[in-house]
């Protein structure tokens, strides 16, 4: 793991540098000394805190609040006078202004303080930047983090989205497309998604964690995200399909990198002849390959977790690599293996009154490498399911369903270590112990 020994410049150093650069050009620019980067949060919904309008919104760089307009009597103008806050950033154009003078700060690219703020709002990259990713970074409080392996706030509500965004951010062709391109001419969905990926890989975060609350709220309100119940698999499929309908370039990348094909046929074994195909043979594309776990009976109270049944992933894959031996069966044959092979382990019966409490808790054993039809894969990501027990309100045992919580485990190629991301917390994990939790989704990368 590469350690960047150059810690962030202190606020005083950056402010002194900023004022020295341009104070001689315009006395009012001395207000740059009042900027407080610690109060800035560009993950929140970009609406005016007074009018609730999303149009023409500016961020006050002194208090971090969002205000509309720049003209006289606008919320931003009034705020600059009432609170003596004078430095603002237009959240669309990323241009800086002094209010109430209504003067644009020119040559802002020469001022490190303003550059850092612009990068926090909209990170940009060149190919050389990506060569040493991931690397150890520092936030404004000098807390270390590994870019690309970022924690998220509000995990109790949006942990499924955190897992999926991390998964796609670690598919290198998808990641690189988002990091190296601008999406000003794309639709709002692609623009917002690209910013999420750019921030996940940012080496210059103000805080060592992110929030996707605004992004998910946008998906629900504007893009028709209405999945109930929702889990990482359902959200991943929804997101892939939405990406493909929104961007031809990304559709091509996803089809090449993540879409496999499986041939499905009915086979009848006859005693007097070799097995023959009956009925229609179809070839179906897939984003996610579902692996069925063996039947499982939920524990009675008092049973030990050590009694959990276990099965090796290779046995689950025989459905797709070997013919069935029953007299009449459906045979599945993988005809295209993608660069990123995504497995889903089917744990829930959504027809159950308590699908989480009655889930299949079988543990899946796996190593870091896997060979399927003579093609070698390496495990890149593992999303696991854990249970949050619901508290009782009347002192009696809780009779409702339990709540799912999702944790993401990602492999760092550079350090050859596994990093577990649970909310805002990131922890190193031993590869040999990953299977001890309920694996739900895995991403495997083809090895050339």
Swiss-Prot record:
GO cellular component annotations of the record: nucleus; spliceosomal complex; U4/U6 x U5 tri-snRNP complex
Annotated keywords: Acetylation, Metal-binding, mRNA processing, mRNA splicing, Nucleus, Ribonucleoprotein, Spliceosome, Zinc, Zinc-finger
Cellular location(s): Nucleus
InterPro entries: Papain-like_cys_pep_sf, Peptidase_C19_UCH, Ub_carboxyl-term_hydrolase, USP39, USP_dom, Znf_RING/FYVE/PHD, Znf_UBP
Alphabetized CDD domains for the sequence: Peptidase_C19M
Domain USP per the UniProt entry, residue ranges: 150-447
Gene Ontology biological process terms, A to Z: mRNA splicing, via spliceosome; protein deubiquitination; spliceosomal complex assembly
First-listed, main subcellular location of the protein, grouped into a coarse class: nucleus
GO molecular function, a single term: zinc ion binding
Residue spans, zinc finger UBP-type: 27-124
Subunit structure of this chain's protein: Component of the 45S U1.U2.U4/U6.U5 penta-snRNP particle, a subcomplex of the spliceosome.
Protein name: Pre-mRNA-splicing factor SAD1
Source species: Saccharomyces cerevisiae (strain ATCC 204508 / S288c)
């Amino acid at each position: 793991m590469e350690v960047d020994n150059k810690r962030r410049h202190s606020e005083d150093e950056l402010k002194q540098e900023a004022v020295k650069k341009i104070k001689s050009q315009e006395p009012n620019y001395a207000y740059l000394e009042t900027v407080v980067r610690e109060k800035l949060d560009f993950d929140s919904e970009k609406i005016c805190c007074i009018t609730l309008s999303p149009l023409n919104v500016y961020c006050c760089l002194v208090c971090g609040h969002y205000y509309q307009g720049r003209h006289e009597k606008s919320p931003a103008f009034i705020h600059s006078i009432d609170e003596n806050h004078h430095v603002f950033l237009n959240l669309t154009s990323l241009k800086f202004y002094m209010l109430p003078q209504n003067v644009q700060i020119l040559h802002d690219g020469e001022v490190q303080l303003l550059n850092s703020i612009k990068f926090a709002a909209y990170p940009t990259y060149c190919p050389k930047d990506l060569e040493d990713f991931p690397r150890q970074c520092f936030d404004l409080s000098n807390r270390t983090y590994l870019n690309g392996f970022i924690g998220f706030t509000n995990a109790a509500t949006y942990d499924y989205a955190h897992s999926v965004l991390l998964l796609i951010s670690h598919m290198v062709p998808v990641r690189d497309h988002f990091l190296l391109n601008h999406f000003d001419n794309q639709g709002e969905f692609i623009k917002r998604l690209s910013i999420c990926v750019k921030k996940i890989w940012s080496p210059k975060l103000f805080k060592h964690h992110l929030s996707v609350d605004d992004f998910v709220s946008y998906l629900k309100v504007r893009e028709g995200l209405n999945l109930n119940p929702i889990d990482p698999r359902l959200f991943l499929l929804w997101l892939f399909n939405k990406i493909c309908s929104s961007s031809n370039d990304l559709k091509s990348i996803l089809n090449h990198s993540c879409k496999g094909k499986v041939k499905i046929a009915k086979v009848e074994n006859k005693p007097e002849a070799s097995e023959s195909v009956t009925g229609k043979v179809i070839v179906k594309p897939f984003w996610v390959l579902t692996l069925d776990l063996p039947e499982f009976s939920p524990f009675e109270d008092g049973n030990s977790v050590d009694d959990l049944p276990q099965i090796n992933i290779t046995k689950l894959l025989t459905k797709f690599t070997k013919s069935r031996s029953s007299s009449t069966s459906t045979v599945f044959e993988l005809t295209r293996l993608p660069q990123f092979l995504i497995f889903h382990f089917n744990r829930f019966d959504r027809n159950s009154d308590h699908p989480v409490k009655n889930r299949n808790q079988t543990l899946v054993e796996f190593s870091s490498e896997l060979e399927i039809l003579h093609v070698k894969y390496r495990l890149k990501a593992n999303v696991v399911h854990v249970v949050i027990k619901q508290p009782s309100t009347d002192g009696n045992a809780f009779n409702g369903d339990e709540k799912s919580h999702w944790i993401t485990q990602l492999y760092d190629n550079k350090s050859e270590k596994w990093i577990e991301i649970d909310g805002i917390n990131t922890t190193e994990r031993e590869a040999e112990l990953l299977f001890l939790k309920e694996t739900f989704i895995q991403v495997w990368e083809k090895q050339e």
